Amino acid sequence: RSTLFPTRRSSDLEYVTTYMVPLQAVAQTEGIVVKDEAEYVDFLVSRIGSKKIRNICYFEVNDCNPLNAIEYILEDGQPFFDAVVLFAGNINWDASKQKVYMKANPNVQALLDNSEELLQPLRKKGIKVLLDILGNHDQAGIAGLSDWGCEQFGKELAQICLDYKLDGIGFDDEYSSYYGSGKWFAGPSSQQAARLCYETKKAMKELCPWETWVHLYYLGYIQSSLPSVFIDGVEHKPSEFIDNVCADYGGSARPVNGMGLSGCAGNSIQLNYGYSISSSGAKALMNQGYGWIMWFAFDPSGTGTVNNNRSHSLRQFRNVAEGCYEQSVRDPKNVYNKISEGQYDPAPHPIN
């Protein structure tokens, strides 16, 4: 029981705020005794978002500071973005050490090394933060690792999520040469792409004490037709180890086996190319059952090599908010800048 907030309703609670409610356990049944150390409990409560369709944004981190996501808020206080994907880390082959590893360029590494000030503010607002992994012009690739190689690389990615407090991994099958030799490699196939997803999800669940996702960008061997993975004769459908998927620019993603449309992005909108969406189009996607809209290359600052696309992007965000949530997006007050290679400014700067 608690007498601190006797009339507080769930609708009174703010989004992205955690409330602590002190509770006292009182035994109502004769013969039942509550131990002193168990009598008082602090119960944490937060308001769950009401969106039927959510927003996932790929940030080109070579150009843009991902902290910009926190400035875009619905009128009811919910963040407009539900997940951010850091684009991107790479899967690479280290010839000297004879191993596959995750290579981070100076920008990705700076975000990871400064996670507390550059990434954790997003998570504290209820926005998931994922690291995307794609090929980098050598024999290592998302779809070309042996079963053993998938297990080893999956464990490395899970450790990265734990060390830097990330919410999962995205996979994007681009720019790999494939056809390496040795114990790390297998011929590229959708089967091996599925196995890497399986091993990564398994390792994250074992290592991270929070919910983690495997997210897919459909390209190359990564498609909706990914097969099941069989371990010791037990079938694991893709829906068991893949949480959400998106298509390439302008497309609608089809679900992997066992997944519904709620795990799929109904549109992939490249903001730097001027892609757009209407309020009626967004509502139609929601009514069809799609659970996500993907945004790519949002950059409200223009402090990298990409021009500021804030005005165009905000119009599209508001179209989605009006069509799907029957409200608008508040005017953003600040912008977060990228300073130079490997440097991001954690401080907000007022929009002129």
What kind of feature is each model-predicted range?
Residues 3-10:
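Short, small-residue-biased leader/transition segments that mark boundaries at the very start
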